[in-house]
From Swiss-Prot:
Its main location: cytoplasm. It comes from Arthroderma gypseum (strain ATCC MYA-4604 / CBS 118893). It is found in: Cytoplasm. It holds the Pfam family TLD. It comes from the Eukaryota. Residues 352-580 form the TLDc domain. Keywords: Cytoplasm. One of its GO terms (cellular component) is cytoplasm. Residues 318-333 have a biased composition (Basic and acidic residues). This is Restriction of telomere capping protein 5. Residues 318-337, 499-518 are annotated as: Disordered. The gene is RTC5. The keyword Cytoplasm applies. Coiled coil: none annotated.
Length: 658
């Protein structure tokens, strides 16, 4: 089939429209199963509008099918109008790879095929450089500052004028010529891999000669805010769930939390003047280094197109397989409501920090497993390990609950900014992802980290009022012993990424840990105050974390001098959430999770092991109490009691060497 298509397209007289159609056919055969294509065709044709011989979708049809708000003024400070933003994106991506010549495209079936591939995780099959190329396409689809004004593709407009794609239409001014020669501005090879087999390189290059000012255009903050609000709300969405459920059950509290997360993320793209919008360099830098999974919710959203309610292919005779529709219904029956985040295991304490918006925010950047890093897609569950509101504000309680947890965890700290100019509403939320267990200085040897797996590296972050993310250093295994990832002491408090001073005869371990490297966090022994430190990494001091992946310290803005910021926090609440890796996968229902199931089925999971540790500690405490009660009745009894204590290692030489 491929050879035949290639033969048909030889010569450079083939039009971009014809090449775009052939490329859509290639995408369809390479990226979809026959069953998925059948469902997609049924969904498209059942709702398509028609003008002459052209069948197409407009913004109203697309928004209604996807279940996204289109002009809804109840979900934000202004109109929560995600519909036009999504439609602008698909109109641009539907013209791929001839955005300059054909964009904005009419949303035909061929355009829809390309849109689904590029907006879901199927893009890796057609883009040579994967995620990097996709970021360029996403930026171009969102850029609306400096873009030539185009008539909106509303149903009324399409009915009044012929649906026609002119062969050499000017397209978006976002794709006009530019003399930019920077390496990261050159995307001539963006889709050469997809076109090489079609023998159409010259056609593509002709279109791409003037496809450079995509990097001079900008994304308005208003447009990006509407998209972010959508992504935060539907982050847990799966292809078998109704998108409308995530909006219908929103209350004022959840909306407020979602707006807070959106504002924090927007601030990380803010270079000082929001009226200028977001340029390509900032967009690419922040997405690549700080929010790599932010667009993942689009996969589930657009995979709705691959499930048709009208088809039930299992009705065939002798068919022993379930249809896609039956599978969707089966999952829907097992799915919890969006107001009850399924990621939190039953039996956990009531969270004060962690809510749906925070979970969505974490899913945008926190790698918790491999090969699927997104915490909302890889079957990860969260178990409440410690809450200062529930378990008390003491290191004794913290030690009892946290040091007995022997699996990865996330610590969240929220409080007030402790500086003279701070107002009552100036709150901050910071945290860290710790892929290994918490260890006190007396526990064994240092942990070894698999630096080839991002989910095995620690991560330090700030969630609000500005999104900041500091990934663990690849050289973490070569750090000195006084630079542990996490340290716990009843006298010096909790330290993450800090340098631990050596104990002295007078102070023992009461010396305060000091900041090191590009990021650290310290919590005092009373759990009342914390310090969050981040720097641009130019101090030449080794540390656990890399510099923040923010536009503030991007390559174009880097300073020649070391810069650091110390944020002092008056703590309101501390929460520690355990990471429970389950055996469920995105294709299975994760909602039937049993606490007895883990990634390694031959050992109990972390919750059971922690409960076993607590039971052991209780038995040991009771045994010691009985020994002490029995000692002192006579010489023989005293000797027997002493012998038992020595055997237990509580007294004697063995105790001194522990």
């Amino acid at each position: 089939m491929g050879a035949g298509q290639s033969t048909d397209t030889k010569g450079h007289g083939t039009s971009p429209e014809e090449m775009s159609r052939i490329l859509a056919q290639r995408f369809a055969s390479k990226c979809f199963t026959p069953l998925e294509l059948a469902h997609l065709k049924d969904n498209f044709n059942s709702l398509a509008l028609k003008q002459d011989d052209v069948r197409y979708w407009n913004e109203e049809v697309l928004s209604k099918f996807l279940g996204i708000p289109d002009g809804d003024k109840t979900l934000g400070h202004g109109p929560f109008d995600a519909g036009p933003v999504i439609f602008r994106m698909v109109s641009y991506l539907g013209a791929f790879p001839f955005q300059n010549t054909l964009a904005p495209s009419v949303l035909t079936f061929d355009a829809m095929v390309k849109v689904i591939v590029l907006l879901t995780d199927r893009y890796g099959k057609v883009l040579r450089r994967g995620r990097k190329d996709r970021i360029k396409l996403l930026f171009g689809s969102l850029a609306d500052v400096g873009r030539k004004e185009e008539p909106s593709l509303e149903a009324g407009d399409l009915e009044q004028s012929p649906v026609e794609i002119k062969p050499h239409e000017a397209g978006f001014s976002v794709d006009k010529p530019s003399n930019d020669t920077d390496d990261y501005h050159d995307d001539d090879d963006l889709v050469l891999a997809a076109l090489e087999s079609l023998d159409a390189i010259e056609v593509f290059k002709h279109d791409q000669r003037i496809d450079r000012t995509v990097y001079e255009a900008r994304i308005s903050f208003d447009t990006f805010q509407r998209l972010l609000m959508l992504l935060v709300i539907i982050a847990p969405l799966r292809a078998f769930e109704k998108t409308t459920d995530y909006f219908s059950q929103l209350d004022e509290e959840s909306l407020k939390s979602a707006r807070c997360s959106v504002d924090s993320i927007l601030t990380s793209f803010d270079a000082g003047d929001r009226t200028n919008g977001i340029d390509y360099e900032t967009f690419s830098w922040v997405i690549s280094t700080s929010l790599p999974y932010m667009f993942d919710p689009l996969t589930a959203l657009f995979e709705h197109l691959l499930f048709s309610k009208n088809l039930d292919l299992s009705r065939r005779k002798d068919s022993g397989t379930c249809s896609v529709n039956e599978e969707k219904q089966k999952h829907a029956e097992l799915s919890p409501t969006p107001s009850d985040p399924a990621i939190i295991l039953p039996g956990s304490f009531k969270p004060c920090i962690l809510d749906s918006a925070i979970i969505s925010h974490l899913s945008f950047f926190l790698p918790t497993a491999s090969p699927i890093p997104n915490i909302l897609q890889n079957g990860i569950r969260l178990h409440g390990v410690f809450s200062s509101n529930t378990h008390g504000e003491s290191l004794t309680s913290f030690s009892h609950n946290v040091l007995t947890w022997d699996a990865p965890s996330v610590i969240l700290v929220t409080g007030a900014l402790n500086h003279p100019s701070a107002g009552e509403a100036d709150t901050i939320t910071v945290g860290a992802y710790l892929p290994h267990t918490w260890r006190s200085p007396t526990f064994g040897s240092a942990s070894h980290y698999d630096t080839s797996d991002q989910s095995q590296l620690p991560c330090l972050f700030q969630l609000s009022p500005r999104h900041v993310m500091m990934q663990g250093s690849p050289s973490i295994n070569s750090l000195k012993a006084n630079l542990p990832v996490v340290s716990f002491s009843t006298k010096s408090g909790i330290a993450i990424g800090c340098k631990i001073p050596p104990p002295t005869r007078t102070s023992m371990d009461s010396s305060r840990p000091t900041p090191a490297g590009s990021g650290s966090m310290w919590i005092d022994p009373a759990l009342e105050n914390a310090e969050f430190v981040m720097s641009n990494g130019l101090s030449h001091e080794e540390g656990v974390f890399l510099p923040p992946g923010l536009a503030t310290w991007s390559p174009s803005r880097s300073s020649c001098e070391a810069e650091s910021e110390t944020i002092k926090i008056s703590i309101y609440t501390i929460e520690v959430w355990g990471i429970v890796r389950t055996t469920s996968t995105p294709t299975q229902s994760p909602f039937n999770h049993s606490r007895a199931s883990t990634a390694n089925g031959d050992i109990p999971d972390a919750i059971a092991r922690q409960q076993a540790n607590w039971s052991f500690e209780a038995r040991e405490a009771e045994r010691r109490r009985e020994i002490h009660l029995n000692v002192g009745g006579g010489d023989s009894e005293e000797q027997t009691g002493r012998a038992l204590l020595e055997m237990a290692g509580i007294i004697g030489d063995s105790a001194r060497h522990r």
